[in-house]
């Protein structure tokens, strides 16, 4: 993947403004609520019976934070995102058996949460760069499925 200097600047700028403890739980909760079939991977998280329970679930919040910190790996290795996520791809495909389509669903929820947080600063150019970054991460996470 080729990154322009503008894309690199935009992506790094987005991450420099993120409050992982706030945004991670919001994005992950949204995914579990909007796409309830994704809940099947998280039965050990306890009560996920409705939106209120999901949004108040400490395990959901912790996993959302973990997911956002997982994106730091891609940020640090933008020139080798596929290689950087090889181990996580294996974990999700071989041990956890996660449907790779769910990575795209979660990335969409992350984009929505970031857009809500950045407001007018989430310009079309910003969205394009962030979407490209997440699409490459999603592809890397799904690599072991191919």
Swiss-Prot record:
Residue ranges occupied by any Globin domain in the UniProt entry: 2-146
Assigned keywords, A-Z: Heme, Iron, Metal-binding, Oxygen transport, Transport
Pfam families named in the record: Globin (PF00042)
Binding site for heme b: 63, 92
InterPro entries listed in its UniProt record: Globin, Globin-like_sf, Globin/Proto, Hemoglobin_b, Hemoglobin_oxygen_transport
GO cellular component, one term: hemoglobin complex
Single Gene Ontology BP annotation: hydrogen peroxide catabolic process
Gene Ontology MF terms in the entry: haptoglobin binding; heme binding; metal ion binding; organic acid binding; oxygen binding; oxygen carrier activity; peroxidase activity
Tissue/organ expression: Red blood cells.
Family: Belongs to the globin family.
Function of the molecule: Involved in oxygen transport from gills to the various peripheral tissues.
Quaternary structure, from the entry: Heterotetramer of two alpha chains and two beta chains.
Matches recorded under PANTHER family: HEMOGLOBIN FAMILY MEMBER, HEMOGLOBIN SUBUNIT EPSILON
The name this protein goes by in its record: Hemoglobin subunit beta
Origin species: Pogonophryne scotti (Saddleback plunderfish)
